[in-house]
C-alpha cells in the first residue's frame, strides 16, 4: 500500500470493482434471510443535494452492515420521475419534460455512483417509463371494477399558478405546498380512490408498527381522524327541506342556539335565490382559500339565511347561518353550534349577538365565566331536561338513544380522512386509463390498450397541457366505436405508492407483480425518508399495500416494518441588501469568515469585500443559496470523508449542521486510520494471537477492542445511533495509535484490532476499508467479510486498576484482582511505596472505597 491516503486514487478503482463484479446484485435465495433496505427515491431535479446524500448514506450503511451479518440484502434505486417541476423547466429551457428528466437522471446517477452507494442498478426504475405506469393504469381499472374508484364533480383545492388540483395534504396554511401560491376553491370533475373504505384498517395497522416513529403514527392517526358521534337531522321550518349535522358532543344538544352551513351547502343556494346580499356573501366565501388548519385562527364571518331549523327535542326555532368556518367537504357541510361549549361557536355568537346557553357545568364546583370564553371540557348536564346531572357518557348514550327512537338521529363513526383525489390537470404524469363513449358512458380502457402512452416529444407553451391542447390525442376507439381518452393525469403520489413493490420484480412483464418475488422480499425491512411525508406518501404507501394484498399480490399487512425519518441538513446562510432593498444571498463557499475564540462568526465578507449578514443555520435551499454541492465535496475530500461526516455530525433523526471544518476533521481521522495500517504493515505480525501469553497491558488493549465491537454492533444494529458508533471507533483509534508494536504479541493484538476497526468502519467508509482490508493480508474482498464479533471472554476483566487518594489527592494506582474485596484492596494500596509516604505516622480517620474504582484514605496527624 502507498504511504499517503489518496481517496482520488482509491475510490474510482473500488467503484469499478463493484460495478464489474455486480457485488450488490440481489437474487432471491430462500436459504438466506432476506433484508430489504429502501431509501425514498428522489425526484430527478438535476443535481443531488446534501439531503439526498444523507438519506442514501444512512440506507447504505444499514445495507452494508446487514450484508456483513450474512443476510441477502436488496437495496434498489430509481426515480420518481413525473411531476410539475419538469414542466416548468421545460418551458424555461425550451425543451420537453421527458428530455429534461432523462438528462437529469443520467447526471444524478453519475453523482450517486461517485458516492459509492451499494445499489442494485439492475433494478433501476423510472416512473415515467410506460413499462412502469402500464401496470399502475391496469391496477386503476381493476380498482374501478371493484367499485373503489369513482368520478364526481367536487369542490377542490385549485392552485391557479400551477393550474392543478391539490389534495388536502398539499395545502399548507392556505397555500400550495410546492409554489406557495394562495389556493382557491373550484368545482371540477375528479377521479377518486376510496381510501376511506380502508380508514379503519389504516388506523388499526398503526398499532402493528412498533418500529415506526411515534410522531409519524400520531400524525397519521390525527389525519385519519376517527371520531364517534351522532348524525342528527333537523327539519327546516316552513319548507320540506332537512339539514343533517354530525356531532361528537350530543351531550351539548340542548345548548344549540344556531346552525352553521357551508357556502356550498344546497340550503345556502336555496336561501340566496331571492337574497342578492346573501348570494354575494356566499360567492365571496366560496372564493376564500380555507384549509382546515386555518379554521381555528381565521376571522369568523357569517350571514343569516332567513331559514330556521326545528330542534328535534325542544321544538325551538334555530336560525341557520352561512358561516365561513364550515367546510362542505368535511362532515355534512353543516354544524350545530353550541356557543357555551365550543370556542369557535362562541366567537361567532358573540360577534353576531346570538344566544349562549349553558348546558354543561364543571364536575367540580369551579366558577366559569361564559361571557369571556366557552367551557369546552366534559362535565355534568344542566338545563337539559331529563338528562340533568348526567356525565358525558351517560348523556351521550341517553340523548343518542332518544334521537334514534324518534328517527332523527343515528350513532355514527366518522373520519376526517377524505377520499384520494388522483386527477391532475397537468401533462407530465401518467394518463388516467378511462374512456368516454359517444353516449357519455365512462368505461375503463381494456388491458390490450394499455399502456395509454404519454407522448414525450412535445412543446410546452406554459398554458395548457399538450395532450389537452392536441384535439387528436384523445381520439380513440373501443370495439370499433369512437371514444375519448381522459386527458387528466395521475397525481404523482400514485407512482410512489407502489414503487417499493415493483423493485422486487422490475423486469416482470406478465403482470403488475411477480407474487413469488414480492412475497420473498416484502415487507421492506428498513424504510428511510423525511418526516414531511408522514400524511401524504407514507399514508398512500400503506393504503396501496392493502390494495395489493386484497388483489392477491402480497401477503403482508404493512409495506415496511421499520421507518427511520432522517433530519434535514442545515448550512450557514449569508446575504447583503441591494440598493433596491432586496436580499442577495451569497453561497457559503464564497464567504470569508472571522470567528471569535469560541468559534462564533463575528464577521463575514463576500469576494467583493462586502460585509454580509449571517442569518444563521437554515435548511439548505436554492432560495437562500446555501446548498453545498456534494460533487464538489467528493472531489475535494473523497466520498468516504463526506459519508463519514454525514453519519458522525448528528444523530440520524436530528438536523445536521454542515460545517466544512467537521468534514476536514473526518478526512484527518481517515488519514490516521490509513497511517496506522501502513505503520503496522511495515512490520506485521508473523504469528497468530496467543491469548494465554498476553501481558496485562495487551489484555487491557484487547478488552477495549472487544468492548468497542460490542458497542458499535449495538449502536448500528439495534439503536441506529451511528454517530456514537463512530465516536467509539475514534476513541479506540486514540488508544491504538499509542499502543506499542515492539513484541510479536503486540503486533498480533494490533492485527486483531485493525481487522476489527476496518470492518466496523466498512459500512460507513467502504472504499478506504476495501483497500485496508487487502493491505491487512485478506485474500477475499471485504464486501464478503463477516461482521466482527465481540469476544465475551476478552471483555471480562480479571484485574482492576484502583486509584488511591489520600485526603482527596491522587497518590497512587494499584492493580488488584477483579473480585478483590475491600480488605485486600486496602492491604495492597497501603503497601504501595508512594501511598505509604502519605499515610505513615498519620492517624487514619476513615477509608472510603468505591468498588472497583477508587480508594480514598482520610488521615490527620
Swiss-Prot record:
InterPro entries according to UniProt: aa-tRNA-synth_I_CS, aa-tRNA-synth_Ia, Leu-tRNA-ligase, Leu_tRNA-synth_edit, M/V/L/I-tRNA-synth_anticd-bd, Methionyl/Leucyl_tRNA_Synth, Rossmann-like_a/b/a_fold, tRNAsynth_Ia_anticodon-bd
UniProt-listed Enzyme Commission number(s): 6.1.1.4
Main location, first listed in the record: cytoplasm
Record keyword Signal present: no
GO biological process: leucyl-tRNA aminoacylation
Record's keyword annotation contains Lipoprotein: no
Residues that coordinate or bind ATP: 622
Positions of short motif 'KMSKS' region: 619-623
Main EC class the enzyme belongs to: ligase
Pfam families associated with the record: Anticodon_1, tRNA-synt_1, tRNA-synt_1_2, tRNA-synt_1g
Coiled coil start-end: none
Localisation: Cytoplasm
Keywords: Aminoacyl-tRNA synthetase, ATP-binding, Cytoplasm, Ligase, Nucleotide-binding, Protein biosynthesis
Tree of life domain: Bacteria
Protein name in the entry: Leucine--tRNA ligase
Organism: Haemophilus influenzae (strain PittGG)
Amino acid at each position: 500500500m502507498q504511504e499517503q491516503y489518496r481517496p482520488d486514487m482509491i475510490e474510482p478503482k473500488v467503484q469499478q470493482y463493484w460495478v464489474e463484479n455486480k457485488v450488490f446484485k440481489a437474487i432471491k435465495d430462500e436459504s438466506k434471510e432476506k433484508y430489504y433496505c429502501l431509501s425514498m427515491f428522489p425526484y430527478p431535479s438535476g443535481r443531488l443535494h446534501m439531503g439526498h446524500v444523507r438519506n442514501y448514506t444512512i440506507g447504505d450503511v444499514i445495507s452494508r452492515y446487514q450484508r456483513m451479518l450474512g443476510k441477502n440484502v436488496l437495496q434498489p434505486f430509481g426515480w420518481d420521475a413525473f411531476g410539475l417541476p419538469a414542466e416548468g423547466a421545460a418551458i424555461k429551457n425550451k425543451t420537453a419534460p421527458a428530455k429534461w428528466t432523462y438528462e437529469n437522471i443520467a447526471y444524478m446517477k453519475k453523482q450517486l455512483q461517485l458516492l459509492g452507494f451499494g445499489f442494485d442498478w439492475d433494478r433501476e426504475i423510472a416512473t415515467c417509463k410506460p413499462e412502469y405506469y402500464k401496470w399502475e393504469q391496469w391496477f386503476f381499472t381493476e380498482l374501478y371494477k371493484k367499485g373503489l374508484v369513482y368520478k364526481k364533480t367536487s369542490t377542490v383545492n385549485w392552485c391557479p399558478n400551477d393550474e392543478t388540483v391539490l389534495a388536502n395534504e398539499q395545502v399548507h396554511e392556505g397555500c400550495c405546498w410546492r409554489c406557495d401560491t394562495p389556493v382557491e376553491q373550484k368545482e371540477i370533475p375528479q377521479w377518486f380512490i376510496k381510501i376511506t373504505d380502508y380508514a379503519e384498517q389504516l388506523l388499526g395497522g398503526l398499532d402493528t408498527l412498533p418500529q415506526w416513529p411515534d410522531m409519524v403514527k400520531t400524525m397519521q392517526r390525527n389525519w385519519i381522524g376517527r371520531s364517534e358521534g351522532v348524525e342528527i337531522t333537523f327539519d327546516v321550518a316552513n319548507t320540506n327541506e332537512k339539514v343533517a349535522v354530525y356531532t361528537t358532543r350530543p351531550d351539548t344538544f340542548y345548548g344549540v342556539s344556531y346552525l352553521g352551513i357551508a357556502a356550498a351547502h344546497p340550503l345556502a343556494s336555496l336561501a340566496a335565490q331571492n337574497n342578492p346580499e346573501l348570494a354575494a356573501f356566499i360567492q365571496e366565501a366560496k372564493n376564500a382559500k380555507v384549509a382546515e388548519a386555518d379554521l381555528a385562527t381565521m376571522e369568523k364571518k357569517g350571514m343569516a339565511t332567513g331559514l330556521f331549523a326545528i330542534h328535534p327535542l325542544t321544538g325551538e326555532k334555530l336560525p341557520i347561518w352561512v358561516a365561513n368556518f364550515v367546510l362542505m367537504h368535511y362532515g355534512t357541510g353543516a354544524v350545530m353550534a353550541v356557543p357555551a361549549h365550543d370556542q369557535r361557536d362562541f366567537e361567532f355568537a358573540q360577534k353576531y349577538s346570538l344566544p349562549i346557553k349553558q348546558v354543561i357545568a364543571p364536575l367540580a364546583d369551579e366558577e366559569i365565566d361564559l361571557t369571556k370564553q366557552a367551557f369546552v371540557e366534559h362535565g355534568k348536564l344542566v338545563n337539559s331536561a331529563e338528562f340533568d346531572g348526567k356525565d358525558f357518557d351517560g348523556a351521550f348514550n341517553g340523548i343518542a338513544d332518544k334521537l334514534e327512537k324518534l328517527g332523527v338521529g343515528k350513532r355514527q363513526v366518522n373520519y376526517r380522512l377524505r377520499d384520494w383525489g388522483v386527477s391532475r390537470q397537468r401533462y407530465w404524469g401518467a394518463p388516467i386509463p378511462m374512456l368516454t363513449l359517444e353516449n357519455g358512458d365512462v368505461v375503463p380502457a381494456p388491458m390490450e390498450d394499455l399502456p395509454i402512452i404519454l407522448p414525450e416529444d412535445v412543446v410546452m407553451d406554459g398554458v395548457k397541457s399538450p395532450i389537452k391542447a392536441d384535439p387528436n390525442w384523445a381520439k380513440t376507439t373501443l370495439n370499433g366505436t369512437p371514444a375519448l381518452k381522459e386527458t387528466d393525469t395521475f397525481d404523482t403520489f400514485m407512482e410512489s405508492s407502489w414503487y417499493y413493490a415493483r423493485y422486487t420484480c422490475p423486469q416482470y412483464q406478465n403482470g403488475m407483480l411477480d407474487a413469488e418475488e414480492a412475497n420473498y422480499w416484502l415487507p421492506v425491512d428498513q424504510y428511510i425518508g423525511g418526516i414531511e411525508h408522514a400524511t401524504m406518501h407514507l399514508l398512500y404507501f400503506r393504503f396501496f399495500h392493502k390494495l395489493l394484498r386484497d388483489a392477491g399480490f402480497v401477503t403482508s399487512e404493512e409495506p415496511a416494518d421499520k421507518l427511520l425519518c432522517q433530519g434535514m441538513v442545515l448550512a450557514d446562510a449569508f446575504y447583503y441588501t441591494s440598493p433596491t432593498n432586496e436580499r442577495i444571498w451569497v453561497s457559503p463557499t464564497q464567504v470569508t469568515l472571522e470567528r471569535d475564540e469560541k468559534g462564533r462568526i463575528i464577521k463575514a465578507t463576500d469576494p467583493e469585500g462586502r460585509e454580509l449578514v449571517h442569518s444563521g443555520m437554515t435548511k439548505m435551499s436554492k432560495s437562500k443559496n446555501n446548498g453545498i454541492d456534494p460533487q464538489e465535496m467528493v472531489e475535494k475530500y473523497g466520498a468516504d470523508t463526506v459519508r463519514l461526516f454525514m453519519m458522525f455530525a448528528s444523530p440520524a433523526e436530528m438536523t445536521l449542521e454542515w460545517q466544512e471544518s467537521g468534514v476536514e476533521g473526518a478526512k484527518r481521522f481517515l488519514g490516521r486510520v490509513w497511517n496506522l495500517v501502513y505503520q503496522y504493515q511495515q512490520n506485521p505480525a508473523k504469528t497468530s494471537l496467543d491469548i494465554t501469553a498476553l501481558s496485562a497491558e495487551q489484555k487491557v488493549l484487547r478488552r477495549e477492542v472487544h468492548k468497542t465491537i460490542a458497542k458499535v454492533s449495538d449502536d448500528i444494529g439495534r439503536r441506529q445511533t451511528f454517530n456514537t458508533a463512530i465516536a467509539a471507533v475514534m476513541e479506540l483509534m486514540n488508544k491504538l495509535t499509542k499502543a506499542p508494536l515492539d513484541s510479536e504479541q503486540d503486533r498480533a493484538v494490533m492485527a486483531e484490532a485493525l481487522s476489527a476497526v476496518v470492518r466496523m468502519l466498512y459500512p460507513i467508509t467502504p472504499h478506504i476499508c476495501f483497500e485496508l482490508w487487502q493491505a491487512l493480508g485478506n485474500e477475499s474482498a471485504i464486501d464478503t467479510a463477516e461482521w466482527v464479533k465481540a469476544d465475551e471472554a476478552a471483555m471480562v476483566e480479571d484485574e482492576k486498576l484502583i486509584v488511591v487518594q489520600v485526603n482527596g489527592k491522587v497518590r497512587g494506582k494499584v492493580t488488584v484482582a477483579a473480585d478483590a474485596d475491600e480488605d485486600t484492596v486496602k492491604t495492597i494500596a497501603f503497601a504501595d511505596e508512594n501511598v505509604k509516604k502519605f499515610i505513615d505516622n498519620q492517624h487514619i480517620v476513615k477509608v472510603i472505597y468505591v468498588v472497583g474504582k477508587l480508594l480514598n484514605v482520610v488521615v490527620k496527624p
